[in-house]
Amino acid sequence: MVNKITVVGAGNVGATTAQRLAEKELARTVVMVDVMEGIPQGKALDQWQSAPIEGFDSRVIGTNGYEETRDSEIIVITAGIARKPGMSRDDLLNTNAGIVKQVSQQIKSTSPDAILIVVSNPLDVMSYVAMKVTGFPRERVLGMAGVLDTARYRAFIAEALDVSVRDIQAMVLGGHGDTMVPLISYTSVSGIPITQLMPQAKLDAILERTRTGGAEIVKHLKTGSAYYAPSSAAVQMCEAIVLDQKRILPCAAWLEGEYGLSGLFLGVPCKLGRRGLESIIEVELTRAERDALAKSADAVREPMGAVKL
């Protein structure tokens, strides 16, 4: 347990993240901050009143300012507008870049030693904005992408094979968008390669559904986007850091030569511990996977160049 974790943004993702952080008692205090007056206060009060029922002692508070977030050990940034039907993650670029910039400026002055987990979309570029504005080292700025994309991939495989999701081992790398790279060569069910259990055509359909997993939910909801699975993914990253678990999780990290790529955030296997990013694991990829990762990197670089800081 750490002393304080802050969640920026009291929308569906932020509020659900705060609730799960409190239920897991990962921090003595969970702070939810949002510009909408009354929203974080009301949701935090509601969550705190669930404590006697759920049996947690983490205090949940809501605020519109950053003073109560001061000296947070971990800050999860979920602030920004959500995707609407027909809107790509990149359509969110300009609006959310401005929001994340303002948030990062506040964080820099109130919690200069915090570890940041960025959830706002477009994820890879917003992670870049947060690192650039705060000046934090790459060990303390991570993007939540691969954990969520991998969860979707695993869920679809488990559904197709009618097996437990717990027996699916998989990893999705690359950008958090249409160019993400599910690694077929590292996908297995209790150690059995997925290619021995499923025809290629069926696997291809799952790969495509994984890439459009977020858009599929947006299409159903019509007025919002996913939040249960994204919040679970963010909390899993927080848990790995708080408990110093040394988990190997696919996260968006700032690359400095790994996989032959530099100067961008991209989903790669990361070892997470109490210091944040402890190392990036370079796994052997097939030629097709390497090419796909390079293509994904190109797709991330393009909107990065359009960001004005």
Annotated model-derived regions:
Residues 2-5:
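Extreme N-terminal starter segment of soluble prokaryotic enzymes
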Residues 14-15:
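N-terminal Rossmann-fold NAD(P) dinucleotide-binding loop
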Residues 53-115:
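Rossmann-like NAD(P)-binding element
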Residues 134-140, 149-309:
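C-terminal substrate-binding/catalytic lobe of Rossmann-fold NAD(P)-dependent dehydrogenases
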